[in-house]
From Swiss-Prot:
GO terms for cellular component: cytosol. InterPro entries: Integrase-like_N, TACO1_YebC-like_2nd/3rd_dom, TACO1_YebC_N, Transcrip_reg_TACO1-like, Transcrip_reg_TACO1-like_dom3, YebC-like. It comes from Beijerinckia indica subsp. indica (strain ATCC 9039 / DSM 1715 / NCIMB 8712). Its main location: cytoplasm. It holds the Pfam family TACO1_YebC_N. GO terms for molecular function: DNA binding. Gene3D superfamilies: 1.10.10.200, 3.30.70.980. The keyword Transcription applies. This is Probable transcriptional regulatory protein Bind_0345. GO terms for biological process: regulation of DNA-templated transcription. It is found in: Cytoplasm.
Amino acid sequence: MAGHSQFKNIMHKKGKQDAIRSKLFSKLAREITVAAKLGLPDPAMNARLRAAVLAARAENMPKDNIERAIKKASAADGENYDEVRYEGYAPGGVALIVEALTDNRNRTAGEVRSYFTKSGGSLAETGAVSFMFDHVGLIEFPASVASEEAMLEAAIEAGAEDVQSNEETHEIITSLESLRDVAQALETKFGEPRKASLIWKAQNAIAVDDEAGEKILRLVNLLEENDDVQNVYANFEVSDTLLAKLGD
């Protein structure tokens, strides 16, 4: 997952703080509401809603919050959110894709642009960097559900494209079209996954030094803290030393 997994782990550690966890729940609820509004309000019949609910459960979001977010989709006075994708460059020529759900495109665009500018990067046109990424499905299981060999065999048999396993997680990559079928096949065998959603996977990762890496991670942090930003993807790698420093 290149830079995506690296800074995702840092954000997870920082997410223990109550204020950040509250913001995370708000973002998860927004995605649940949007997913329910775009399709049926039943996770079993709505793949995007199911993915949103899985993500919420993985963060221990209370069941009541999840159900309230689903019901909000049918409320007459509910907010309407637009899905927006921003693309740009961070220091060192690193490419970033930012996905947002916003009720004010001008506000969000202005804020995202300011983050890039303050961090020494630049916001670009849509399509400027997405060709450096593959839009694919990602399924995650805890490492404890199966051995690396068993997961690899089951995933490939189900139609997955790649499997990456470590001490904590099995990450299964699928095509856009096969995500749902592969997820269902693996769930039958190993139980409910921790995640099953679409991501932007970098085709290649750029190795950056600690100075540039710190600037990039600062930009990612600014983006992640924005209420409208849902996901951030990048194509960089930093040293374990910097990760340990920022993860403390």
